[in-house]
Regions:
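Active-site-proximal helix/loop microenvironment
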Residues: 85
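Long, contiguous binding/interaction regions
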Residues: 1-43, 47-80, 88-156
Length: 156
């Protein structure tokens, strides 16, 4: 229905408390980044917002975030979804805190909105009053600046 929230879902999470040297090398982790938190979800834009929030709530860095552009409806497995994100931090407690912040944003804060009665057209208009390190870098702004994250069909 028009103006209804269209919520995203977290599909899978995993914490790696002590990353292997080979994986650390592949992800270009610094020596202080010992632990990882992985998340998959069925909506990439909401998850990018959530990963940024994690960088504000915990001592973590987004070291990998990629969309699967076939979309969640075309995922190759039940838990693959539309995006995978990886947070790195100095210890399991920090990555767990970052992961919890990301999950909270996906489940309770950020969402698309229906623009018509059958929910076949939607938009994402999310105001971020203070960006974290992830979206700041991607948007080319200073960390802590405000950002409007907007996604909509071309004519809307």
């Amino acid at each position: 229905m028009k103006r209804d929230p269209l919520k995203a879902s977290v599909l899978a999470t995993k914490i790696i408390p002590n990353v292997s040297p080979d994986l650390a090398k592949e992800l270009n982790l610094g020596p202080d980044m010992k632990s990882l938190a992985l998340i998959t979800a069925d909506c990439d834009d909401v998850t990018y917002t959530a990963l940024d929030e994690a960088t504000k709530k915990a001592d973590v860095t987004v070291v990998y975030a990629k969309s699967f552009y076939g979309g969640a409806a075309n995922a190759n497995t039940k838990l693959a979804g539309e995006i995978i994100g990886i947070l790195a931090g100095p210890n399991p407690a920090e990555v767990k805190s970052g992961l919890e912040a990301a999950v909270d944003v996906i489940e309770n804060q950020a969402h698309f909105v229906s623009a018509n009665e059958d929910d076949s057209i939607c938009y994402y208009a999310h105001c971020i009053s203070r960006t974290g390190s992830y979206l700041s870098e991607g948007a080319g702004i200073k960390e802590g600046e405000a950002l409007a994250y907007l996604i909509a069909p071309p004519l809307e």
